[in-house]
Design a protein with these regions (language model features):
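Accessory "access/gating" subregions that flank catalytic or transport cores
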Residues: 2-13, 21-26, 40-138
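Short, well-structured active-site flanking segments
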Residues: 13-16, 160-162
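Short, conserved phosphate-binding/catalytic loop or strand-edge motifs used
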Residues: 15-23, 36-37, 169-171
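Catalytic phosphate/nucleotide-handling subdomain of diverse soluble enzymes
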Residues: 28, 39, 117-189
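A glycine-rich phosphate-binding loop feature that marks nucleotide/adenosyl-phosphate handling sites
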Residues: 38, 59-62, 76-77, 151, ...
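Catalytic cores of secreted or luminal carbohydrate-active enzymes
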Residues: 177-212
Length: 212
């Protein structure tokens, strides 16, 4: 659910992170709030640039330098710098040093933050490759692929998402409740309502229209 805050605060990572932390505080604390801030800020930054390292840096700027969320990202980055091709070696490192056995509960955020970092680095700005890596790594596959998919979807725009992903969905969505959507495949509706009527910063990346 945290993706929303990056989407309504384009090109403003700090505001996106602030909204995300406020919302996430209802059900999360600690590292969960850092994860919310990172994801929302990264999505927001993706409206300005498709450079994945800039996007990651913008997200990391919104969380403490000494938190575990930042540390697992740093560990993945070191693996990537050492060998940008061998994502499996990076996954093995995550499983050995940051795996589920190191944290309480059944679905801790830190191992999954590592998977998101892996997908973002090794995916290198390719939408399909990034969500595929997030899924192939296992653990919390739906959230991980969904989070990085939102970042990449904004960064590359509709034209950067292959037809094999867009075509089957087309303009239809199946939900457990009653909802209505129009032109899901191509159209992103932006209004001034989320910003309280204030003009949003220009979102220049991936062909996004800066006008409200």
């Amino acid at each position: 659910f945290i993706d929303t805050w990056g989407l309504i605060a384009p090109a403003d990572p700090a505001r996106a992170a602030r909204y995300a932390v406020t919302a996430a505080s209802v059900s999360h604390d600690g590292e969960g709030l850092h994860g919310a801030a990172f994801m929302a800020a990264a999505i927001s930054k993706a409206f300005e640039t498709s450079d994945m390292e800039e996007i990651i840096a913008a997200g990391l700027q919104q969380i403490p330098a000494d938190c575990l969320y930042r540390k697992v990202f740093d560990a993945v980055e070191r693996c990537y710098r050492n060998d940008p091709q061998d994502w499996r070696a990076c996954l093995a490192m995550l499983q050995a040093e940051w795996g589920y056995d190191k944290y309480p509960g059944v679905c801790h955020i830190i191992p999954n933050a590592g998977v998101c970092a892996l997908a973002l680095y090794y995916g290198r700005g390719d939408f399909a490759r990034t969500i595929e890596l997030a899924s192939m790594c296992g653990w919390d596959t739906d959230c991980n692929a969904g989070n990085v998919g939102t970042i990449l979807g904004v960064a590359v725009g509709p034209q950067g998402i292959d037809e094999c992903y867009r075509g089957p969905i087309n303009d239809e969505i199946v939900l457990s409740g009653i909802s209505g959507y129009s032109q899901l495949q191509q159209k992103a509706v932006r209004t001034g309502l989320p910003s309280g009527g204030r003009e949003m910063p220009g979102a220049s990346g991936a062909g996004w229209d800066a006008a409200l």
